[in-house]
Amino acid sequence: MMSSLFVEGMLLKSADESCLPAKGKQRRTGDLRRLNHHRQPAFVRWICRRKLSGVSRIEFHSGGLTPPRAVLNPVSPPVTTTKKRVFTFGKGRSEGNKDMKSLLGGKGANLAEMASIGLSVPPGLTISTEACEEYQQNGKKLPPGLWDEILEGLRYVQKEMSASLGDPSKPLLLSVRSGAAISMPGMMDTVLNLGLNDEVVAGLAGKSGARFAYDSYRRFLDMFGNVVMGIPHSLFDEKLEEMKAEKGVHLDTDLTAADLKDLVEQYKNVYVEAKGEKFPTDPKKQLELAVNAVFDSWDSPRANKYRSINQITGLKGTAVNIQCMVFGNMGNTSGTGVLFTRNPSTGEKKLYGEFLVNAQGEDVVAGIRTPEDLATMETCMPEAYRELVENCKILERHYKDMMDIEFTVQENRLWMLQCRTGKRTGKGAVRIAVDMVNEGLIDTRTAIKRVETQHLDQLLHPQFENPSAYKSHVVATGLPASPGAAVGQVVFSAEDAETWHAQGKSAILVRTETSPEDVGGMHAAAGILTARGGMTSHAAVVARGWGKCCVSGCADIRVNDDMKVLTIGDRVIKEGDWLSLNGSTGEVILGKQLLAPPAMSNDLETFMSWADQVRRLKVMANADTPNDALTARNNGAQGIGLCRTEHMFFASDERIKAVRKMIMAVTPEQRKAALDLLLPYQRSDFEGIFRAMDGLPVTIRLLDPPLHEFLPEGDLEHIVNELAVDTGMSEDEIYSKIEKLSEVNPMLGFRGCRLGISYPELTEMQVRAIFQAAVSMNNQGVTVIPEIMVPLVGTPQELRHQIGVIRGVAANVFAEMGLTMDYKVGTMIEIPRAALIAEEIAKEAEFFSFGTNDLTQMTFGYSRDDVGKFLQIYLSQGILQHDPFEVLDQKGVGQLIKMATEKGRAANPNLKVGICGEHGGEPSSVAFFDGVGLDYVSCSPFRVPIARLAAAQVVV
């Protein structure tokens, strides 16, 4: 009786359930082929017809170009029976699947899935992320029993391959790769060709040719030395460049077998010179050290920085994938490539990738050589190319997403080495989502989940205002690796890019090629330019994931890091010179070119309409001018949730002088005279905003900041001189007034409703301007929905006082102008006490709007102006997980919001509740606001689409 056992989500099959090789003459392609390192490998046809638990059949037919076909039935949920740390895959069977990413990492889970659906995947084993976690907890040593489990998995691979690690007569070489649950391109380590030593390379040379064998050996020595032993790659690269110069060749592929054999000896000497120890020749020791190195790379500075930048938390560690090697460097019938099943930059439904003849995969991914377009493969390896195209279709249909695929062709045989969901730009993400809905692959709710909020952020980035205007300034053209436009000053190191960014400067990071260590500078830079590397190089993949403009593989440039100069022909560009990049065309442009805001595409409008159909939360905008209001409306805002009246005061010298006269006034009469000068300015601005928001609510906050913010900046003598000119007062009078205005802690002082209560004429002027503008616009056919918001309320009595002033002025204006209209009066909840007594305040207010910026400030006791002195220390030490001014503190500030909402609605069931801090555009905060039942969020105009999508993703 055959048995099947479920273990932690895998289907483990008994030996007699495995597919057996059919006898007889074999025919080409579409078959699952046994990996073989010989020059003339035998093709094997596998036919598996036995019914398995949950799998009806997996068929692989030989002959013609018929692709593998898999017919899968759903498997019932597995029952955990034991803790397993090593999972094997290959030959049409796997101990894992695509849903086990948290345990096997993305790479391991997808290798298992590809093998199980019948694609040609070299057999291997995956060490789980939980094993990595145990390794870290065990003092960075392999936990007890794990090495034996790895060797057991290795025996499976050796049996599948009829080859052995360290056996010169039947050599088995391995790749050792990382793979976390969330893709982190280039951040962790890889070792290829593991298992080579002097004896094994001689055996491999006898079977596969000396040049191939010694090329593989020198690559292994370089990679193992760098990744495992910590020897700088540059030490090996120097030897390679010296050898090429000595032999008078330009390419690695032009070196002979004898040259490479000599290079191997030089590489072995590098170990002794750099580390004082010899290269380890025992293959099993090599494997143990490589596994340790991959586990160690999880905690490397570059990996930690990447996770910090991308806010990746909660992962156990990286998995380790050990796989038998297939070789793309066995001559002109071999090669390696990376592709995306659709264009990751534009979303176009067309294979997008690169291919290198006679090369290994790291040459493409690391950007060491600039590869050819994928189309070259169709010409030189047509059968393998056709199989690859068919595999891409299978994977897209299976995963229902755009896939990123690594593959190798060994002597015209295609092998699939990796697949994962492809990283894409904002433009690409939206088009792929819309196209896949139109193709019937996914539904609109799935599409909403496929586009990340940061993708929309990228789409809102500027482009060049007039590309035709800079054509005469184009000095070089590289590969358009990541779209968009970037303008900045040239820097030549990641550290300088971070430093310049911290100083508020826009930097263009220029490198010969980027490495994972550059990740901090890449994130800080406005754009990235590299001399080497293709569209799938490290720089390109990381930049696209961030929506960062990148031009790669620009062969016309020469980078001198030591001299900090960039040479293009006879032109020299120094550090600090201005450069512009067009990541959509690959153009490198001299000088500082003008940027223009982006426009919504038809695909984006379609996509956002799907998001709007499902979201519950309304999305408003914080807008202070008519132009801001128009931008907000064009971005889909459903009204203005915060219009800050004080920003209007800085629009001209006349306005600010009138404000200063009001501040310096001694008597109410003087103050009223100054306010009368301000009223027409305010009224005009409100008219423009009401016109822009025709038919949508506009929430106007009365004056909030402390008065000292409107005084001139500079030393006291300068301030007094300027105020004397502006107000006509004597210097003594001004000194006296400044002394009275000075405060120890202005943000907790004389501001907000305290100003309106102390100077009612200030509230009266602003309210009169609001209602005069509203009636005037109404008379012109504009539908006006005004809402007046009283700031910094901490007691119901404060709000009651201001409401009395507001309603009195409204009645007077309506009587004067012969028209009445509906309006609302509410308050900001930004003082913790207001949240605690929300039921009392709700009896006075028609709406609450949480000012989360000040509410966070007062709840934590952090001054926003001073928090930078310690915030980075708190974040780096884990005292805080996020900047609370960017990501809402849900346990503290969030609970005040939840409590105030519940109390307020209990006292006033018709109470409208929203939030108008910048947290309104932050996705995790938006999810919280939806969960506690707020009616709307309000954020900056450019973040409105992000908030719309975040509100929809909460629902789906």
Swiss-Prot record:
SUPFAM superfamilies named in the record: Glutathione synthetase ATP-binding domain-like, Phosphoenolpyruvate/pyruvate domain, Phosphohistidine domain
Protein name: Pyruvate, phosphate dikinase, chloroplastic
Written domain comment of the UniProt record: The N-terminal domain contains the ATP/Pi binding site, the central domain the pyrophosphate/phosphate carrier histidine, and the C-terminal domain the pyruvate binding site.
BP-aspect Gene Ontology terms: photosynthesis
Assembly: Homotetramer.
Main localization category: plastid
Binding-site residues, Mg(2+): E830, D854
Regulation: Activated by light-induced dephosphorylation. Inhibited by dark-induced phosphorylation. Both reactions are catalyzed by PDRP1.
Post-translational note: Phosphorylation of Thr-536 in the dark inactivates the enzyme. Dephosphorylation upon light stimulation reactivates the enzyme.
Organism domain of life: Eukaryota
EC numbers on record: 2.7.9.1
Role played: Formation of phosphoenolpyruvate.
InterPro entries: ATP_grasp_subdomain_1, PEP-util_enz_mobile_dom, PEP_util_AS, PEP_util_C, PEP_util_CS, Phosphohistidine_dom_sf, PPDK_AMP/ATP-bd, Pyruvate_phosphate_dikinase
Upper lineage: Eukaryota, Viridiplantae, Streptophyta, Embryophyta, Tracheophyta
The organism of origin for this protein: Flaveria pringlei
Residue span of the annotated presequence: 1-79
Molecular-function GO terms, alphabetical: ATP binding; kinase activity; metal ion binding; pyruvate, phosphate dikinase activity
UniProt-listed PROSITE patterns: PEP_ENZYMES_2 (PS00742), PEP_ENZYMES_PHOS_SITE (PS00370)
